[in-house]
């Protein structure tokens, strides 16, 4: 990690330092493991009681916890946000590529901006446009007429199909495939006929996509991922899906075709969203949610049975299977009571 002075940390975070600004830190560490030379943070107040024992060179805290610190304190509005900014500043992760490798295969008409880097054995097909500071890792494939905006970075073995576009400042992790065919077939008396997928995928600015995620191209119109969306690992985004500004989706989630997800949504991991539905802005769905119909109002939604012991779960499952029978018996009892009241 890059070394920084406490004065530099204060500038990066916009915080107020109480202590020696000349001291240097070279690592970010959890509060219970931090040592001299480390910077740490307190985001959960329940751990404030441990501040007096913390050995870090500096702790990033809210103002109400400053006096509990054993040493230097950096007072910030949000310690977790400050932590994120400090890690960004200290990050020394290598780039996917540093220059244009001799083994890269690049079509003669590819338009490249300044400071483009392309790793070994990457293939860049005809008509591709690469913005300034684009970095393409080893073994990537960029199909015909695809476009990558300024500062966009692809790690090794990413596949970008033909005519797909990514905006500025995007990050795509290894193994992800963008623009493969959507799942479109017509059935002619038992024979499946493939429907060519003629749309594409349009991805906005500052979008991050995790490893081994798949985003299908649209059937006729485009699949759309708006600005500031974050998609985790191993997601399946089907054809013609639209994902609104600032939405986040953890790993394992599946979104069926033509579903529209609003702005600032949070979709819990391993959730499944049915096709041709609409999710309103600001909806949060807890993990393993099964969304079968549209959600029209902002709020928190859940489905599924929380973890139980196997014995408890078997009892619950048995009761669930008996609900229809119990409902019939309840209606019969209600009818008998109504008859008694009438008599």
Curated annotation (Swiss-Prot):
It is an enzyme of class 2 (transferase). Keywords: Acyltransferase, Lipid A biosynthesis, Lipid biosynthesis, Lipid metabolism, Repeat, Transferase. The active site is at residue 239. One of its GO terms (biological process) is lipid A biosynthetic process. One of its GO terms (cellular component) is membrane. Its EC number is 2.3.1.191. PANTHER family: UDP-3-O-ACYLGLUCOSAMINE N-ACYLTRANSFERASE (PTHR43378), UDP-3-O-ACYLGLUCOSAMINE N-ACYLTRANSFERASE 1, MITOCHONDRIAL-RELATED (PTHR43378:SF2). Catalyzes the N-acylation of UDP-3-O-acylglucosamine using 3-hydroxyacyl-ACP as the acyl donor. Is involved in the biosynthesis of lipid A, a phosphorylated glycolipid that anchors the lipopolysaccharide to the outer membrane of the cell. Homotrimer. Belongs to the transferase hexapeptide repeat family. LpxD subfamily. This is UDP-3-O-acylglucosamine N-acyltransferase. It comes from Vibrio parahaemolyticus serotype O3:K6 (strain RIMD 2210633).
């Amino acid at each position: 990690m890059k070394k920084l002075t406490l004065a530099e940390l204060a500038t990066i975070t916009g915080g107020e330092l109480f202590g020696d600004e000349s001291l240097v830190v070279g690592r970010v560490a959890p509060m219970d493991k931090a040592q001299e030379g480390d910077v740490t943070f307190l985001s959960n107040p329940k751990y404030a009681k441990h501040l007096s024992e913390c050995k870090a060179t500096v702790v990033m805290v809210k103002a109400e916890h400053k006096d509990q610190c054993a040493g230097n304190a950096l007072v910030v509005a949000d310690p977790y946000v400050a932590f994120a900014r400090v890690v960004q500043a200290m990050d020394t992760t290598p780039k996917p590529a540093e220059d244009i490798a001799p083994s890269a295969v690049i079509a003669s008409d590819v338009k490249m901006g300044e400071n483009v880097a392309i790793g070994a054995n990457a293939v860049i097909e005809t008509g591709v446009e690469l913005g300034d500071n684009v970095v393409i890792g080893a073994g990537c494939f960029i199909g015909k007429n695809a476009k990558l905006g300024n500062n966009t970075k692809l790690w090794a073995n990413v596949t970008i199909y033909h005519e797909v576009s990514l905006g500025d400042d995007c990050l795509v992790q290894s193994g992800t495939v963008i623009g493969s065919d959507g799942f479109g077939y017509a059935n002619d008396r038992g024979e499946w006929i493939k429907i060519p997928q003629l749309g594409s995928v349009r991805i906005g600015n500052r979008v991050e996509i995790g490893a081994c995620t798949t985003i299908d191209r649209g059937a006729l119109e485009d699949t759309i991922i708006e600005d500031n969306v974050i998609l985790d690992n191993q997601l399946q985004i089907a054809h013609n899906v639209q994902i609104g500004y600032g939405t986040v989706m953890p790993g394992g989630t599946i979104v069926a075709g033509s579903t529209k997800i609003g702005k600032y949504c949070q979709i819990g991991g391993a959730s499944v969203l049915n096709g041709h539905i609409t999710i309103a802005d600001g909806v949060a769905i807890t993990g393993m949610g099964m969304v079968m119909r549209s959600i029209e109002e902002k709020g928190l939604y859940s489905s599924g049975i929380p973890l139980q012991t196997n014995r408890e779960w078997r009892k619950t499952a048995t009761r669930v299977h008996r609900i229809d029978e119990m409902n019939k018996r309840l209606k019969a009892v209600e009818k008998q009571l109504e008859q008694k009241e009438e008599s």
